[in-house]
Amino acid sequence: TSEYIEIEDNSEMLAAIDVEETINLEKAYRFYVTADVPNQEKINFILTCSDKIGTYQTAFSIDAFAPEFALNEITILPNNIVKPGETATLKLTFDNVGNSVAYNVLTELFVASSDVEFENTTIRTDEVAAGETFFVTTDFSVSSSAALSSVYEVIYSVCSKYNVLHSNYDL
């Protein structure tokens, strides 16, 4: 068993199987993969068949695939410099390095200082294919009363149903 699998239907009854006969059971078992499964997680199963005479067991595994986000680049447009009283654009570039498409990707930004104000703190991307690069942008302003050469920690989170990336960046 795996912490990433929830088995809903785990048994199937058959009337009889003749010697040398092969039986295919379509939609015989039902299980769900949890949302937090890591990309390329190997999930092991044990199949047990039994009758009045004895028991047969075999094992098999499947690989679960999930999106996986990685930060590629952070850019402040137009020139990577923002002075007090100015407005600029923050561009974050991410890669989906996982093996599955990510749906309804949500990027959230947070800064604790009142000197920095983002136009959008939540940015939605509908779909990001496996291996695809995507970016989010938002304008932000730095208060005119902010001290010159101040550094502000920006916390960002990128999440979809099956993956979350949390980190921070000094602005």
What is each model feature region?
Residues 1, 93-98:
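Asparagine-centered strand-capping/turn motif at beta-strand->loop junctions
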Residues 1, 105-109:
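Hydrophobic beta-strand segments
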Residues 6-37, 116-146:
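Intrinsically disordered, low-complexity Pro/Gly/Ser/Thr-rich segments with frequent PxxP/GP/PP motifs
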Residues 7, 68-75, 118-119:
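Proline-enriched interdomain boundary motifs that mark the N-terminal boundary
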Residues 23, 43, 88-90, 134, ...:
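Hydrophobic core residues within well-ordered beta-strands of beta-rich domains
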Residues 26, 30-70, 141-171:
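Terminal connector regions
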Residues 57, 99-105, 166:
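Short acidic/proline- and small/hydrophobic-mixed sequence motifs that coincide with surface turns
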Residues 80-86:
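Short, solvent-exposed loop/linker segments at the N-terminal edge
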